A protein has these predicted regions:
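A cross-kingdom feature that marks ATP-driven nucleic-acid transaction machinery
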Residues: 2, 34, 41, 49, ...
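Interdomain hinge/linker elements that couple catalytic modules in large macromolecular machines
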Residues: 2, 143-144, 148-326
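Pre-Walker A adenine-sensing motif
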Residues: 2-17
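Hydrophobic anchor at the beta1->P-loop junction of P-loop NTPases
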Residues: 24
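Conserved catalytic segments around the Walker B and adjacent sensor/switch elements
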Residues: 45-61
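Short glycine-rich substrate-engagement loop in P-loop NTPases that contacts/grips substrate
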Residues: 56-84
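Structural recognition of the conserved hydrophobic beta-strand(s) that form the central parallel beta-sheet
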Residues: 114-120, 141
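Short regulatory helix/loop adjacent to the ATP-binding pocket of P-loop NTPases
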Residues: 123-139, 154-155
Length: 418
């Protein structure tokens, strides 16, 4: 099964010849190498680029071990450049080369060379590769498969069934290829323990790995919940686990984020137009990895749907925060009181902004009021949207608030502008 990944291919195409090193980043096993060496390579060939003008180097291949030497690699590349036509250089797992920054910097000085690299492992995660090229690197971040990408490749399968699979096993390309649910689950659990967490432990010399594992379980169990290191430290104590300081927890959370396992969403005071430093929320980059950490015992569709909406927004290149709105209400004694209510997502991209609520169902008037109350009290005219699980016809209420179904939101790239 081939996933076309057209969004990322189009990104690579639009960034061609920009005199920068294109750095393809993302969680391990998200398909970075396939994107570059198969899909983008095919695009170049289909558009008339000769094979001998595409230089590919997979540094994780034992046969290419000599090319891990920077001078040998540079000489190899220069030896393949025979004319003044454009050459495309693609290097996979660039961190395996010593002094690779110098090599790529040398390539930047050659006018007819366009360079693309990937890099990720325990000693040099892809977030670090991008850091090395601040000012000279052009990041193209690859996420796990989106729901629409999966549906495109499996158009003969019922959408609701695919949603159940996606919600449970996520969107890592290899996971989709397995036929049985047991194979998917076993793969994810093994990948989490033997690749992602092992990378973090080796990279940061973590000896007491049980605490790291336990922290990830707590974060996985509480996706979409407001938290901070001190709260998580208290959770360790209350659950009878060993004491873990807030500072250590903060470090571990940073490690998870650096490895692209989780994303942190800051709180934003909508009326005050300022960020609130704590608490904040975490969402898993891949739902399958989240569920694997909990041994597939905590499949809560409400929270997983919220996480899926967050991931979709991030994939569409939006900046996503958690919103807070202060409102004045009357209490049971008719006294005026201030309350803070939450907007699930404050979504920004350039001059665009959207406010989005994830609501599994609007099953009663009270539930509808609960979801609309924060949106009604936002003092601006940016679009306000509620996403529900049911596949409904899009509708607008008297306040201009749009309610749409999850399927429409996930499947239509322009759903926020309908």
């Amino acid at each position: 099964m081939i996933f076309n990944r057209l969004y990322y291919i189009n990104k690579l195409i639009s960034h061609k010849h920009n005199k920068m090193v294109k750095v393809v980043t993302g969680i391990r096993r998200s398909g970075k190498s396939f994107l570059l060496f198969e899909l983008f390579y095919k695009h170049l060939i289909d558009n008339g680029i000769a094979e001998d003008h595409i230089i590919t180097i997979a540094l994780d291949d034992r046969l290419n071990k000599p090319l891990r030497n920077p001078d040998t690699c540079l000489a190899h590349i220069l030896g393949l450049i025979k004319d003044k036509e454009m050459y495309y250089v693609m290097i996979d797992e660039v961190q395996l080369m010593d002094e690779f920054v110098d090599v790529l910097n040398s390539l930047l000085h050659i006018p007819n060379v366009d360079t693309y690299v990937t890099g990720s492992n325990s000693k040099f995660l892809s977030s670090d590769v991008m850091t090395e090229f601040r000012g000279r690197g052009d990041e193209i971040h690859v996420n796990p498969l989106s729901m629409s990408e999966i549906c495109e490749a499996m158009s003969d399968v019922d959408w609701n069934h695919l949603w159940e699979l996606y919600m449970t096993y996520g969107g890592l390309p290899m996971t989709i290829q397995f036929q049985t649910e047991k194979e998917k689950a076993d793969y994810l659990k093994k990948l989490l323990s033997e690749t992602y967490l092992k990378d973090i432990k080796e990279r940061h010399n973590i000896v007491n790995d049980l605490e790291l594992e336990q922290l990830m379980s707590i974060v996985a169990s509480g996706i979409g919940s407001l938290t901070n290191p001190q709260k998580l430290s208290n959770a360790f104590l209350s659950s009878g686990k060993t004491k873990l300081s807030a500072q250590t927890i903060k470090q571990y959370l940073d490690y998870f984020c650096e490895a692209f396992l989780i994303n942190k969403s800051e709180r934003f005071d909508i009326k005050g137009k300022r960020y609130i430093s704590t608490p904040y929320k975490f969402y898993f980059t891949d739902l399958g990895l989240r569920n694997a950490k909990l041994n597939f015992r905590q499949i809560e569709e409400t929270h997983l749907m919220e996480n899926a909406i967050y991931n979709e927004l991030v994939m569409r290149d939006f900046n996503v925060d958690v919103g807070v709105v202060e409102i004045r209400e009357k209490d049971e004694k008719n006294n005026s009181v201030r309350r803070q209510v939450e907007v699930d997502f404050v979504v920004n991209q350039g001059s665009k902004r959207y406010y989005i609520q994830s609501a599994f169902a609007l099953s009663s008037i009270e539930k509808t009021q609960q979801e609309t109350r924060p949106l009604i009290n936002i003092p601006d005219s940016f679009k306000k949207i509620i996403v529900v699980k049911d596949d409904i016809l899009l509708r607008r209420d008297q306040y201009g608030i749009v309610t749409m179904g999850l399927k429409q939101f996930l499947m239509d790239w322009n759903s926020l502008d309908l």
